[in-house]
Amino acid sequence: MGNLSIRNASVTYPSQRFGGAVTALKNVNLEIAPGDFVVALGASGCGKTTLLSVLAGFLTPTEGEILLGGQPVLGPGSDRGVVFQKHALLPWLNVIDNTEFGLKLQGVSKAKRHEIAARNLELVGLADFHKHMIYQLSGGMQQRVGIARALTCNPAMLLMDEPMAALDALSRETIQELLLDVWDHTHKMFFFITHSVEEALFLGSKLVVMSPRPGRITNTYDLDFNKRFLETRNARAIKSSPDFIKMRETVLDIIYGDEREAGEPAEYQRA
């Protein structure tokens, strides 16, 4: 499929409250290659979700362009899967029917879509839950179904908008590790939004820090903590290592400095 390229993307909304218009994103540039796990970190209102919506094709940038494999992104498409903070699963369908729903809309045969959905449910650890209804699952399991569903149409890229924000700490850690296994298995592009500095450092192969509104990318870091986890399976040792702690403090210093400069309240999580 090729890279996803964000070129001078800006988004401006009409707003009576802010004197006619508010700029959510300003001149954002970023290159995401196949196999990159990009995590965006920034204050509430800095434009993270706006950027994800532009990548998903839900919004059109006021200026600039988004290219995927050299082709302009003009709307939603099966080449990009989206996982939201709230799972958005269909409560009247069971787990496997939810997972294969996108393939059904594409006209894929029942046998083929069942095969693909079952494979992705196995990947997220839900091989024994095909017939369960959504209300019978925990929050973490529901998000696993959401991930499996997003994978089922074989997108080039997964877009994730704080998918673990509502989970308890243990479920959150479990899903973090699951995501890295999925990333390692599929080699897809990931674009992930979070308020947690620790989560950002643990998951990302590339971290982008965004300024308060108008959202710009102020800092970019290449990371390898995720690869260390895949090699060692010891998340606690990685998160308590001196270089992880040093990077966390570096990022926090940037974030709090940006917020003081903008006069915005600090709302970041260390963990």
Residue ranges with predicted function:
Residues 41-43:
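The feature captures the beta-strand-to-loop junction immediately N-terminal to the Walker
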Residues 158-161:
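Catalytic Walker B motif of ABC-type/P-loop ATPase nucleotide-binding domains
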Residues 56:
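Helix-to-loop junction immediately C-terminal to a conserved catalytic motif
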Residues 152-156:
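A short, proline-enriched helix->beta-strand linker immediately N-terminal to the Walker B motif
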